[in-house]
Amino acid sequence: MDQDIKTVIQYPVGATEFDIPFDYLSRKFVRVSLVSDDNRRLLSNITEYRYVSKTRVKLLVDTTGFDRVEIRRFTSASERIVDFSDGSVLRAADLNVSQIQSAHIAEEARDAALMAMPQDDAGNLDARNRRIVRLAPGIDGTDAINKNQLDTTLGEAGGILSEIKGEKEQFYEYLEKFADDTTMIRGVTWVYNGGSAVGGETSIVINKPTAVFAVPYIEINGDSQEVGYQYDFNASTQTITLAKPLAAGDFLMAMTSESHLPLESLLAGTTGASSIGTKDGGTVQSALDNLGYYIVPESFGAKGDGVTDDTAAVQAAINAAKGKTLWLDASKMYICQNLVIPHAMTIAAGGRRQGGGLIPKGNSGPVVHSGDFILITAEQTVTMFNVTIDARGRPLTKVDGQRLNGLRQVDNTSGVYRSGFQLYNCNISGFSGLNIVGGAARSFGIIKDTQCESSDLTCIRIQGVDWRIDHTYVGRSGTGHGIELLNESNVVSNCDSYFNKKSGVVYTQATGKTFFKLIACTLNSNGEHGVYIACPYMQPAGIIIVDNRFWNNSTSSDGVYSNITLSYGRGHIVVGNIHEAYQPADGSSSARAAYCVNLLNGARPAHMLDNYDPAYSYRTDFCNINVVDKINYNTHHIGSAKTFTVGVSSATSQAIGVFVDGESFPRASIGNGGIRFGKGDAAPAVGLGFDNNYPNHVVSFKGLAVLGAWDTSTFRVGGYRIWAGNGAGQLYFQYGADPTSQTDGKLFVGRTVSPPASSSSSGNTGDIAIDSGFLYVCVAFNTWKRVALSTF
């Protein structure tokens, strides 16, 4: 049977032009409407739509509120296109039009019938998902009913439900009374005669091995009975007396209060805890022991076998441990995916590098394990004791965007202090991202006695302030640093940072005042610097680097990086550090820093006294500029940028003394107006200095001696050189140049002696004598000549 609708078509809204798929005799027989499930609007030709062609119309109005456009042919049965009159000429065309109009009317009538409520192929009426309106109430069982009739029926059902609720409340009241009875043990159900009464019973004896103290609740065939009205119980005879006899087959259930619970043996067993809903089983006592301050993941279904995915169980345990301690069994390893700690709590386990570990599941097929293994979102402190969080050997991706961090704390954006986490004796190692991340603006975090190794990026990154990292072992980062600090007032002490791809410790700060302490740490065998510190600008900086040990840094490029690098800032304190080599021997192949201390961008220390070995501690020099103090095994250098000053109590006090070990007096002393020298057996007395009696002169205390050797120690006065000859009484001098031999100069003459008795009397060359008659000159040793004074 042809069931197609030919004269009506509906289009979804959205377009503006629509086709007319049927033929029509006149445009007035075509109706265009906007339609929705509960509304219809007939449009007017020309003002609300118009014909684009004979078979196409265009809408001129908005379709908001409607979801379909309907085009329907509705041919008038009374308004004939062709009207026949008696005696008129009958033409075939007119007959055709008249016949077509009749056919259209019939076709539209058939479509209307199909659209009203047609029959399906089985003869059933089909409302086609539309409402049937003005339906009378049903009478017979097979009649349809209308909504009013249904509402009335449901209202009656609601009354029945209300009665059921009343019974339920009554039942709860019984239970409450039952629970409030604190004089005995409660909660045992008893069924009479196997669930089927004989019939006619009004007295029922409860036959149980233990005494029943009360029967607070009875049901007969599901109907509750009121104690004192519909039944009574006599505890001495253990008898229930009913107001109405039981019928045959009645089901009577009583709830009793007794001195002995049938469940007691079950609950006391080794699996008794499973009877009260715990997932890990065990005894009830063990479950009670775990309920107090400690939470264990086994209570939530964790296996800890190193194979099963315990994510859901461990996360449930974390959620339940707010303000408590989550205890990880020291003998187990919990495989997990990403975990979140949303509140303050403590996690404790068996010890660093022992049991009780949280292990990332890692990549599985195409699924990449990335993000943060443990993310702390709590505003308060989260503390971990003896916890191992180890990703070494797990399948992880070392590609940016797909890396897995170990433990990360979210940044603090509240504008007030939020505490950082605290780690004690933990091990967090082996992640493809960062092992440990302290959130920005988080303060007072602690990492102590912890091992943190083998991250692919930096091992520890702290973005907050006032953190303390102590007695922690950090190393073997794949591409990053050991410890990276990005804010002020942090302290790293008693730590080892080793074998990192880049630097052992890095502190950089973009703005603000810098403050950082590095105390008693060992930084060795790092690819770049031992410690690198970059202040934002020249400022009084609170950088303290004290009592640390540096060796074999700059391994990625021997002699390029430095043990200590400081950029910008003044007032840095660098004291007591030791710079050494792993192989202190000639020809050693171990890497060394370019400088022990490298000062960049004008960085200036306030105090810098380090110990180093000139032969093995560096490749280039101790420091890149000669303005710092330095100590090695046998010298002490005071930087050229400083004036060495020693204050004394008076002008006669000694300021500096140089002693030989075991001697009581100095060999040399500075003070009391000069420099004095001695033998160590008495106070120094000879030397040079200043005396007010001889202004503008250097005074020799207790004499002045000059060796006077012509080739090593001539005595100079202005441009004159004076030295001793090779004979007694010979003294030579020369002006302008050093002598080339012992006699390369003029001989001082003018020694006056007693007149000789003869020409061979004793005398030295140059001696002169005079008496009343002669002038005597010793021209050679013991050889004299004389001339009469009268000849002059």
Curated annotation (Swiss-Prot):
<dbReference type="InterPro" id="IPR005604">
    <property type="entry name" value="Phage_T7_tail_fibre-like_N"/>
</dbReference>
<dbReference type="Pfam" id="PF03906">
    <property type="entry name" value="Phage_T7_tail"/>
</dbReference>
<keyword id="KW-0945">Host-virus interaction</keyword>
<keyword id="KW-1160">Virus entry into host cell</keyword>
<dbReference type="GO" id="GO:0016829">
    <property type="term" value="F:lyase activity"/>
</dbReference>
<comment type="function">
    <text>Functions as a receptor binding protein (RBP) and probably mediates the attachment to the host capsular exopolysaccharides. Displays a depolymerase activity that specifically degrades the K30/K69-type polysaccharides of Klebsiella pneumoniae capsule, which allows the phage to reach the host cell membrane and bind the entry receptor.</text>
</comment>
<dbReference type="GO" id="GO:0098994">
    <property type="term" value="P:symbiont entry into host cell via disruption of host cell envelope"/>
</dbReference>
<keyword id="KW-0456">Lyase</keyword>
<dbReference type="InterPro" id="IPR012334">
    <property type="entry name" value="Pectin_lyas_fold"/>
</dbReference>
<comment type="similarity">
    <text>In the C-terminal section; belongs to the K30/K69-specific depolymerase family.</text>
</comment>
<keyword id="KW-1233">Viral attachment to host adhesion receptor</keyword>
<keyword id="KW-1238">Degradation of host capsule during virus entry</keyword>
<keyword id="KW-1235">Degradation of host cell envelope components during virus entry</keyword>
<comment type="similarity">
    <text>In the N-terminal section; belongs to the Teseptimavirus fiber family.</text>
</comment>
<dbReference type="InterPro" id="IPR011050">
    <property type="entry name" value="Pectin_lyase_fold/virulence"/>
</dbReference>
<comment type="subunit">
    <text>Interacts (via N-terminus) with depolymerase 2 (via N-terminus); this interaction probably gives rise to a branched tailspike.</text>
</comment>
<keyword id="KW-1227">Viral tail protein</keyword>
<keyword id="KW-0946">Virion</keyword>
<dbReference type="GO" id="GO:0098996">
    <property type="term" value="P:symbiont entry into host cell via disruption of host cell glycocalyx"/>
</dbReference>
<dbReference type="GO" id="GO:0098015">
    <property type="term" value="C:virus tail"/>
</dbReference>
<protein>
    <recommendedName>
        <fullName>Depolymerase 1, capsule K30/K69-specific</fullName>
    </recommendedName>
</protein>
<dbReference type="GO" id="GO:0098671">
    <property type="term" value="P:adhesion receptor-mediated virion attachment to host cell"/>
</dbReference>
<keyword id="KW-1161">Viral attachment to host cell</keyword>
